[in-house]
Amino acid sequence: MNNNISITTEALSKAHLHSFKHHASSVNGILLGKADKNSILITDIIPLFHTQTLLPMFEVAMIQIEKYCRDNNIDMVGYYHSNQCIANELEPEPIAKKIADRLNNELNNMCFLMISKIEVNRPSGLVSIDKVGSDWLKNRKTLITIDTTSNSEDINEILKRNLQNIKESQIYDFEEYLSNPTRDWLNKSLVL
């Protein structure tokens, strides 16, 4: 359980664009940044999948992400997931729980975030999910703040502009990379 979770506007935009691109599917990805005992700062994301997450594909993705993190002195700090069914937006699907369990066993300090609607009481559109016993449950106490150090523009305006410019078509997940290796699964060329 983390007392403080912050996410940059760029990382937040990428996560939402991934869910917008595959709005009829579940999507998931890895959160990158820095973590200590009491806080996590999410500075980037790596979109993973938008259809069934299969263990062999996940293993290959994790090997690549671990290498990328080592080479760039950045940490894996968590996992994000968006359900296919919006009516059940805050109850993680079974595969999301399995992936979160695996990462929770491997990472010292991690967060599990569900992508939701952006609302007044939830400006990031993210909800923290915590491990409670053997299950993952919504944490009503953790506030996820938006780190505006590099961009103080309102997240709603950023997402609106990105959607108007059809930026969701320019974000690629690891699954798309496996189908077409010319796709930039790190999304380094994506300008938001």
UniProtKB/Swiss-Prot annotation:
Pfam families: UPF0172. InterPro entries: EMC8/9, MPN. Coiled coil: none annotated. Residues 5-135 form the MPN domain. SUPFAM superfamilies: JAB1/MPN domain. Belongs to the EMC8/EMC9 family. This is ER membrane protein complex subunit 8/9 homolog.
